[in-house]
């Protein structure tokens, strides 16, 4: 079982000054072993401090819960390979906090703690539950199963390699993110190319969430998404399929809705089951689990047997096993339960080591509420504000002291009346073996108690009063009478000369004969002194204080209020041997500051002699300086690069020089680039290119303010001066950072002795390294190839200044720099390092491809280009761009060659179809950006050597084959003509004599005319009027249903009638709730009717405009809310996703072509309803077909390319229409201006009052690169958590049809899914003309156009307005 270092709160080992015997330590360990073994599975471990050696990780073996904190820190020699194979998958919960600090080589926690789910934060580290600080090699956090930080915040700071921070949504893990502090990491420098799972392949796998107005994909690493559960789960966690865990779970579970399968519990865990409260017979323990009564009692028994007074006496109270009873309750020693007090609650306070010194208000507060002191009290108050009131508030309830009460050198005390309830001093333990009340050297003490009102009994022991010059003897004699101690005292116990007098005599001079110093201690010895009656010598008082200048007097800093700037150490009088020889008395002054001058003097403390004289003695004030020691770390290191080979480094002196800082040691080492970048194909347009930045040159003034140098601000405005509020805020943040760092260093650095000695000067040293005689503890990350030598470490000494110019560096190279402060005592070593990362500036020509570009004709139509890689690029080359075009031609082609492909081919391969002479130029892209283009080179693509022979042989064969196809076609066509016309083809030389029935064959969709009754006109469509009607028996189970009936005008031509029915034929293929459904066709007789699903609220554009406040036809509804807009967007996306799955491309998605049903559901509209109504929304480009340019994507406007991605662009415009209540897109621009604006990369502005979430979705749809736009299914995935439950029942997204394809025939190629309608003219020779011409002349816009389906092309109607 893993067991941590026992350093929890309240543990005696936390106090470096505590002295706990080995028996006590064994008892303490036994108690915590009981806690560990209490669980049947043996998986609970206590707080752990893993430091210095990686072998200490073995303590974590088999731990499931750490009941306490986990600190991993200070490993300077570990390397990445040391952590490979270290894995603790059982650890799921930490009850306090997780701290990581300066662990070299640790790059990620994904393998170390793959299942850590909950950090409870019961006790925090400076208000933080997760601290990651100065992890020099960490690249990612990687806690991909972390779902809940119950209490506290997150602090991630000064991790120069740490990425994947902007891809984490902390609001999912924490209740509040306002107090998080995430600064000074690589992520903040925009250097991270964070790639979430699936991004490389263009198929995002991770969910998107909205933070600060940005909709971002969420992941922990390139292999692990951040787990985002549905909002219904409310923090309980969920399974991968989205099923919520039981409400009592916290973070995760193994089965849904099962409290026994939780990873962690929201409230309490009882025998493996999560419960709201512990059941009867069990008790809450440590805030998260239940234990039985016997276990709690056993904890208390073990604690008592340990003989450790600080061990808490566990009791049962209100269903909880706790260390002590709360205020207002007292523990029953038999049952170990808490019972309410009758009146003021007696509270027995047991004093650690039997003596408690009250030397400050803070120490007095520790006894607040105590009524019985089981031990002795020493009052030693040198000063303070409002001290009497504070003492009465904290000590005023004490009624009984079992030992003695000693008032010593309390300059601030005038009276002891603050002990207002003190009634009994038992004297079970006596001071100096005799005294139960001891008052010594209290110059302001004038009154003990008001003896007329106060009663005090002293059972054992005597009184002792000396050197209380303002305390009258009458007060002392009266105390003898009241307390019952009269007659117990000897004549020397109460000094008649030094109590109540205002004088003190020190006639003799004491001389120091031995002085020895260390960095924090001084040992003093002085000549022995005895008064004539050696019994009058009570002891010595050694006074000392810091003295920067040698002008101190004894009475500096003392006043009538008791303030005293001197620190006083009391020393007992030495024992007097029989022969009268006495060892020189001495004193060891501890806890001094290094390299600090102190003023010191010593004086005797004597009683008055029988003759009335006081035989005192005092030394002169001497000045002693403590020794130097290792300085503290240099402050605020700052680095800039002013050229391609230099870095300017500045810092501030250490806050504690601990000597005269003479010089600094500066070490620097080149940091290799991340070799993983070679493995990623950055030619994939879905990936962001990695980058590295350098800090532009700046100047730092004397106050530490940064000013940009002149050459960086050319042609730029000067920065505005900071306001007082900004300056104050920066100062507060800086002060808080320093406070946190001081707290961190104080907590994690545990002093340890360098050597052991038997004398008083066993000086303790910290965990700092030995004297620096070797290079520092640099550690190279695993980004370096195994066979690559480790970069050399360089060093330089910097004398008497805090800056250095490091020269001779490589261009655009990262360096890790360490700065050590050294003082004149080099044998002690130099300080812990302050480190900073810097990068030199890029070389302008380093990324240029030099040398000739050669080519090789490897196979037909493939050219292998070869070129030399830049010898010394700026960082790494990530890709090459090859720009080539046919000489004299117009079309230019740019192709991308990844570094990985270049390493394989030593160049790139081009597929060139057309023979001819070509020009080519190449440029490289490095971590610093794009290099420059090479000079143009030329290559020739020849005709295939055997092309003429092939043509001679294959020509006749092809001609014969085509002739056979024509003959077969004619035979089949003749047979069809004999059977009668069918399908969309017609060949009549005079089509006006044909009726619709001759080109349309009735099928199962045919509806008898007498089942349709027309009620009223709805509006004019493309072919004729549209009516509302009643249809009988056309929907199973519904005798009558309201429908929309489309008609064709009587004056319509035969072609228009054919197109009218063809549109109906196309819609027969659709069966989706969010696409308007065809219900039937009446083709027999005139007029021809098409029966459609009735959309009661008309088209979406008209409906939105009716919701405007000033609209005359406003139905009384308000503008749609955010939730309603999201519902509309999902319904439109669902209909479009269905059409994409059917391999149809819409090409004209707009609000006018969406319909609103009676229940306000939005559906993709039917055909022919809106072309004439909204003809102004279309534009006739070059006299050709009508184009909806304001809804078209850039690639559609440029090249006539229509794909599912171009429909997504149009969907973004529809969203804009919904939020603006159907305003015209690009209002104020003409159609020609819109064409140019969009093709140049423009898009619509932010709509007024548009929520950030919707605008982020619009921007995703308007990505210029089509591949960067989301699919309609991905859009629904982003919105699904906010949709109505009914959406799951009716949508295509949740239907069985929306499943991954099982065969290649069903795969959708979104990039090539172009809309290419066929009509008689499309089979002409004009197919060989440019795609743009075909688009302009032969593809008019319809509301729904077919694409490829099952290997054939559906002919589509031409519904251009005449």
From Swiss-Prot:
Residues 759-951 are extracellular. Residues 1-37 form the signal peptide. It is a single-pass type I membrane protein. Residues 705-714 have a biased composition (Polar residues). Keywords: ATP-binding, Cell membrane, Cleavage on pair of basic residues, Developmental protein, Disulfide bond, Glycoprotein, Kinase, Membrane, Nucleotide-binding, Phosphoprotein, Receptor, Repeat, Signal, Transferase, Transmembrane, Transmembrane helix, Tyrosine-protein kinase. Glycans are attached at residues 53, 115, 148, 332, 374, 434, 455, 551, 627, 642, 660, 707, 765, 779, 917, 930. GO terms for biological process: glucose homeostasis; insulin receptor signaling pathway; positive regulation of MAPK cascade; positive regulation of phosphatidylinositol 3-kinase/protein kinase B signal transduction; protein autophosphorylation. Autophosphorylated on tyrosine residues in response to insulin. Disulfide bonds join 45-63, 163-192, 196-219, 206-225, 229-238, 233-244, 245-253, 249-262, 265-274, 278-290, 296-321, 303-311, 325-338, 341-345, 349-370, 472-505, 683-896, 822-830. Residues 508-629, 633-730, 849-944 form the Fibronectin type-III domain. One of its GO terms (molecular function) is insulin receptor activity. Residues 38-184 are annotated as: Leucine-rich region. It holds the Pfam family PK_Tyr_Ser-Thr. It is an enzyme of class 2 (transferase). ATP binds at residues 1022, 1046, 1093-1099, 1152-1153, 1166. Residues 694-714 are annotated as: Disordered. Autophosphorylation activates the kinase activity. It comes from the Eukaryota. The keyword Transmembrane helix applies. The modification Phosphotyrosine is found at residues 993, 1174, 1178-1179, 1335, 1341. Tetramer of 2 alpha and 2 beta chains linked by disulfide bonds. The alpha chains contribute to the formation of the ligand-binding domain, while the beta chains carry the kinase domain. Belongs to the protein kinase superfamily. Tyr protein kinase family. Insulin receptor subfamily. This is Insulin receptor. It comes from Xenopus laevis. The gene is insr.
């Amino acid at each position: 079982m893993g067991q941590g270092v026992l350093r929890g709160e309240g543990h005696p080992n936390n106090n470096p000054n505590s002295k706990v015997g080995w028996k006590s330590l064994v008892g303490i360990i036994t108690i915590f072993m009981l806690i560990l073994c209490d669980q049947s599975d043996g998986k609970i471990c206590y707080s752990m401090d893993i430091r210095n050696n990686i072998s200490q990780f073995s303590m974590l073996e088999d731990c499931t819960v750490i009941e306490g904190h986990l600190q991993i820190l200070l490993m300077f020699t570990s390397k990445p390979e040391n952590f490979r194979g270290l894995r603790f998958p059982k650890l799921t919960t930490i009850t306090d906090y997780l701290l990581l600090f300066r662990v070299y080589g640790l790059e990620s926690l994904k393998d170390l703690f793959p299942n850590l789910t909950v950090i409870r934060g019961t006790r925090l580290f400076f208000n933080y539950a997760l601290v990651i600080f100065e992890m020099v090699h960490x690249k990612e956090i990687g806690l991909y199963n972390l779902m809940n930080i119950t209490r506290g915040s997150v602090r991630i700071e000064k991790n120069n390699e740490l990425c994947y921070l902007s891809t984490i949504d902390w609001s999912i893990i924490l209740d509040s993110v306002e107090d998080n502090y995430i600064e000074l990491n690589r992520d903040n420098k925009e250097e991270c190319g964070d790639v979430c799972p699936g991004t490389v392949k263009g198929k995002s796998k991770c969910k998107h969430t909205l933070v600060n107005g940005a909709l971002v994909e969420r992941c922990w690493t390139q292999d692990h998404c951040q787990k985002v559960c549905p909002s219904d789960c409310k923090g309980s966690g969920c399974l991968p399929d989205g099923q919520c865990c039981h409400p009592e779970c916290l973070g995760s579970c193994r089965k849904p809705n099962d409290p026994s399968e939780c990873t962690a519990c929201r409230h309490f865990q009882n025998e493996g089951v999560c419960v709201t409260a512990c059941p009867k017979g069990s008790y809450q323990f440590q805030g998260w689990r239940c234990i039985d009564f016997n276990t709690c009692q056993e904890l208390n028994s073990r604690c008592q047997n340990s003989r450790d007074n600080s061990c808490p006496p566990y009791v049962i109270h209100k269903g909880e096993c706790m260390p002590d009873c709360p205020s207002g309750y007292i523990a029953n020693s038999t049952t170990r339960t808490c019972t309410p007090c009758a009146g003021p609650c007696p509270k027995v306070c047991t004093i650690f080591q039997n003596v408690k010194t009250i030397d400050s208000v803070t120490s007095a507060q520790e006894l607040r509420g105590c009524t019985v002191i089981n031990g002795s009290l020493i009052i030693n108050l040198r000063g303070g504000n409002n001290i009497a009131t504070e003492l009465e508030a904290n000590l005023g309830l004490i009624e009984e002291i079992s030992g003695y009460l000693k008032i010593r050198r309390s300059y601030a005390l005038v009276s002891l009346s603050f002990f207002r309830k003190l009634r009994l001093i038992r004297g079970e333990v006596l001071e100096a073996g005799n005294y139960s009340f001891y008052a010594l050297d209290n110059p302001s003490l004038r009154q003990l108690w008001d003896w007329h009102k106060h009663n005090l009994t002293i059972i054992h022991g005597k009184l002792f009063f000396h050197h209380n010059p303002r305390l009258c003897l009458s007060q002392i004699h009266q105390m003898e009478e009241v307390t019952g101690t009269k007659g117990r005292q000897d004549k020397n116990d109460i000094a008649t000369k030094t109590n109540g007098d205002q004088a003190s005599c020190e006639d003799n001079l004491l001389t120091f004969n031995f002085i020895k110093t260390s960095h924090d201690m001084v040992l003093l010895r002085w000549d022995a002194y005895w008064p004539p009656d050696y019994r009058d010598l009570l002891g010595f008082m050694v006074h000392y204080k810091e003295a920067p200048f040698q002008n101190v007097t004894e009475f500096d800093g003392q006043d009538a209020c008791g303030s005293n700037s001197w620190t006083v150490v009391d020393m007992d009088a030495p024992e007097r041997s029989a022969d009268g020889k006495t060892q020189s008395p001495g004193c060891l002054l501890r806890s001094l500051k290094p390299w600090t001058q102190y003023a010191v003097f010593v004086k005797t403390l004597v009683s008055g002699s029988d003759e009335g004289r006081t035989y005192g003695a005092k030394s002169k004030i001497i000045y002693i300086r403590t020794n130097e020691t290792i300085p503290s770390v240099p402050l605020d290191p700052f680095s800039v690069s002013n050229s391609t080979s230099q870095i300017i480094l500045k810092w501030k002196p250490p806050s504690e020089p601990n000597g005269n800082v003479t010089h600094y040691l500066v070490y620097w080492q080149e940091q290799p680039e991340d070799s993983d970048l070679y493995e990623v194909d950055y030619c994939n347009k879905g990936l962001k290119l990695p980058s590295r930045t350098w800090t532009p040159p700046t100047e730092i003034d004397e106050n530490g303010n940064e000013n940009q140098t002149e050459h960086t601000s050319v042609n730029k405005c000067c920065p505005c001066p900071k306001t007082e509020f900004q300056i104050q805020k920066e100062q507060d943040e800086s002060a808080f950072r320093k406070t946190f760092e001081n707290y961190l260093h104080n907590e994690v650095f545990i002093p340890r002795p360098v050597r052991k000695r038997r004398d008083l000067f066993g000086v303790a040293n910290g965990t700092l390294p030995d004297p620096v005689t070797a290079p520092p503890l640099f550690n190279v990350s695993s980004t370096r190839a195994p066979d690559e030598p480790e970069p050399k470490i360089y060093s330089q000494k910097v004398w008497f200044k805090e800056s250095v110019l490091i020269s001779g560096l490589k261009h655009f190279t990262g360096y890790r720099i360490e700065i050590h402060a050294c003082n004149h005592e080099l044998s002690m070593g130099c300080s812990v390092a302050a480190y900073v990362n810097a990068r030199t500036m890029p070389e302008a020509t380093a990324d240029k491809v030099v040398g000739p570009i050669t080519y090789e004709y490897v196979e037909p139509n493939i050219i292998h280009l070869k070129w030399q890689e830049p010898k010394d690029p700026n960082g790494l080359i990530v890709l090459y761009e090859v720009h080539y075009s046919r000489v004299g031609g117009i079309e230019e082609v740019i192709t991308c060659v990844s570094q990985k492909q270049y390493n394989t081919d030593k160049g790139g391969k081009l597929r060139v179809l057309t023979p001819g002479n070509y020009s080519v130029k190449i440029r490289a892209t490095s971590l610093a950006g794009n290099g420059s283009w090479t000079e143009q080179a030329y290559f020739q693509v020849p005709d295939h050597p055997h092309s003429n022979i092939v043509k001679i042989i294959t020509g006749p064969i092809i001609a014969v084959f085509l002739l056979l196809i024509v003959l077969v076609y004619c035979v089949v066509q003749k047979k069809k003509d004999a059977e009668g016309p069918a399908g969309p083809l017609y060949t009549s030389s005079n089509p006006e004599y044909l009726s619709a029935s001759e080109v349309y064959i009735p099928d199962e969709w045919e509806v008898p005319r007498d089942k349709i009754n027309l009620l009223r006109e709805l509006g004019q469509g493309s072919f004729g009027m549209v009516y509302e009607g009643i249809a009988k028996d056309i929907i199973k189970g519904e005798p009558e249903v309201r429908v929309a009936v489309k008609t064709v005008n009587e004056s319509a031509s035969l072609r228009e009638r054919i197109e009218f029915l063809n549109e109906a034929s196309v819609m027969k293929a659709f069966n989706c709730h969010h696409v308007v459904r065809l219900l039937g066709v009446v083709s027999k007789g005139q007029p021809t009717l098409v029966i459609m699903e009735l959309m009661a609220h008309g088209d979406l554009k008209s409906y939105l405009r009716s919701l405007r406040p000033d609209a005359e036809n406003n139905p009384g509804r308000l503008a749609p809310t955010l939730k309603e807009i999201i519902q509309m967007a999902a319904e439109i996306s669902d209909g479009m996703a269905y059409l994409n799955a059917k391999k149809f491309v819409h090409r004209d998605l707009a609000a006018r072509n969406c319909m609103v049903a009676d229940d306000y559901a939005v559906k993709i509209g039917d055909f022919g309803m809106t072309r004439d109504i909204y003809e102004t929304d279309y534009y006739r480009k070059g006299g050709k077909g009508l184009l909806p340019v304001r809804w078209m994507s850039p690639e559609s406007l440029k090249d006539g390319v229509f794909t599912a991605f171009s429909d997504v662009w149009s969907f973004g415009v529809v969203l804009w229409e919904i939020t603006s209540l159907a305003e015209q897109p690009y209002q104020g621009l003409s159609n020609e201006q819109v064409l140019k604006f969009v093709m140049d990369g423009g898009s619509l502005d932010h709509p007024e009052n548009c929520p950030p979430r919707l605008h982020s979705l619009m921007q995703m749809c308007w990505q210029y690169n089509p591949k960067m736009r989301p699919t309609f299914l991905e859009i629904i995935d982003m919105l699904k958590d906010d949709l109505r439950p009914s959406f799951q029942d009716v949508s295509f997204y949740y239907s069985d049809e929306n499943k991954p394809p099982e065969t290649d025939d069903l795969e959708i190629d979104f990039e090539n899914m172009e809309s290419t309608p066929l009509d008689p003219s499309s089979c002409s020779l004009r197919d060989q003309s440019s795609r743009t011409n075909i688009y302009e002349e032969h593809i008019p816009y319809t509301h729904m156009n077919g694409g490829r389906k099952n290997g054939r092309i559906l002919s589509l109607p031409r519904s251009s307005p005449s």
